[in-house]
């Protein structure tokens, strides 16, 4: 007997999610039904597709080859159906978006009202995460991510580029003065990230040409928290321009060592899974973000 499309879809879901239980939850089926479908598929093929242990699932050699082919076939089927539906569908339904808190507050927040006015049938759910999450496990449709994409199962649409600036409040400067060199900076209270540690490497070069790794006196996993600490005069921070430029323009923050800061670019992208047919609401949202970046006032964001 030939395998059914439902059996193929269940098999791919099990592999992508990493377990029968997660696949069952995503598909809205019982664990036993999902397990039976995969066993039935293996019986039809006459081979074992999965190595099953109490701790994890892994693909057999035959399973690996079969998974790649089946996944590609299902993607093409979904894409074909999506293309047909898109010709007559208006964007609608729930759209789940994940981004770090500063991105939500300073990039996405001004766009929510105009997006909903244009697409009133789309319901938005915003999630703020300070760490990288698994989009499938958290049921996220689109994530706004900084840095270079490394996961081959994801697609990314470049949105804008950001550059970090070293800043302090006027109150802090009046009490402790302005650092002019890295040696000066070492004598000041610096605000750092508990994670990711890479953000504690500031874009200023030491005498050996390497970027300076700051030793911090206060830390947080949230850039927005560090910004508030900085505004309150607690120390010197190094944060992305898109989240502090307004405060600099208003005189609430002062840019430091501008002549020594290197233009280390940080790209931001809209990220989504490549194994899904892109729904009209996902495409509409990403297109809307790209449109905003192209038409934003100078200095708001730098188009990627």
UniProtKB/Swiss-Prot annotation:
SUPFAM superfamilies linked to this entry: Periplasmic binding protein-like II, Winged helix' DNA-binding domain
Record-annotated DNA-binding residue ranges: 20-39
Keywords assigned by UniProt, alphabetized: DNA-binding, Transcription, Transcription regulation
A molecular function GO annotation: transcription cis-regulatory region binding
InterPro entries: CrgA-like_PBP2, LysR_subst-bd, Tscrpt_reg_HTH_LysR, WH-like_DNA-bd_sf, WH_DNA-bd_sf, YafC/CrgA
Any Pfam family matching the protein: HTH_1
GO biological process, one term: regulation of DNA-templated transcription
Coiled coil region boundaries: none
PROSITE patterns, A to Z: HTH_LYSR (PS50931)
Domain HTH lysR-type, residue spans: 1-60
UniProt record similarity statement: Belongs to the LysR transcriptional regulatory family.
Protein name as it appears in the record: Uncharacterized HTH-type transcriptional regulator YafC
GN (gene name): yafC
């Amino acid at each position: 007997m030939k395998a059914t499309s439902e059996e193929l879809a269940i098999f791919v879901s099990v592999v992508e999610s990493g377990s029968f239980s997660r696949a069952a939850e995503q598909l809205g089926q019982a664990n036993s039904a999902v397990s039976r479908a995969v066993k039935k598929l293996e019986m039809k093929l006459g081979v074992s597709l999965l190595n099953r242990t109490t701790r994890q699932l892994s693909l057999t050699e035959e399973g690996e080859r079969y998974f790649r082919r089946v996944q590609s076939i299902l993607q093409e089927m979904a894409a074909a159906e999506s293309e047909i539906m898109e010709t007559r569908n208006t964007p609608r339904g729930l759209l789940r978006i994940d981004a770090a808190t500063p991105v939500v507050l300073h990039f996405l927040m001004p766009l929510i009202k105009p997006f909903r006015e244009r697409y009133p049938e789309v319901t938005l759910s915003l999630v703020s995460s300070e760490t990288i999450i698994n989009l499938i496990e958290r049921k996220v449709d689109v994530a706004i991510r900084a840095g270079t994409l490394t996961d081959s199962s994801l697609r990314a649409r470049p949105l804008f580029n950001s550059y970090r600036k070293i800043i302090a409040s006027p109150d802090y400067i009046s009490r402790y003065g302005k650092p002019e060199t890295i040696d000066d900076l070492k004598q000041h209270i610096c605000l750092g990230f508990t994670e990711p540690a890479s953000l504690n490497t500031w874009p200023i070069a030491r005498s050996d040409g390497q970027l300076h790794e700051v030793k911090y006196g206060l830390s947080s996993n949230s850039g927005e928290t560090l910004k508030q600490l900085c505004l309150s005069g607690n120390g010197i921070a190094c944060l992305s321009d898109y989240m502090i430029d307004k405060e600099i323009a208003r005189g609430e923050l002062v840019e430091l060592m501008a002549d020594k800061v290197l233009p280390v670019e940080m790209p931001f992208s809209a990220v989504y899974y490549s194994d899904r047919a892109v729904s009209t609401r996902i495409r509409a949202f990403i297109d809307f973000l790209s449109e905003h970046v192209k038409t934003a006032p100078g200095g708001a964001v730098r188009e990627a």
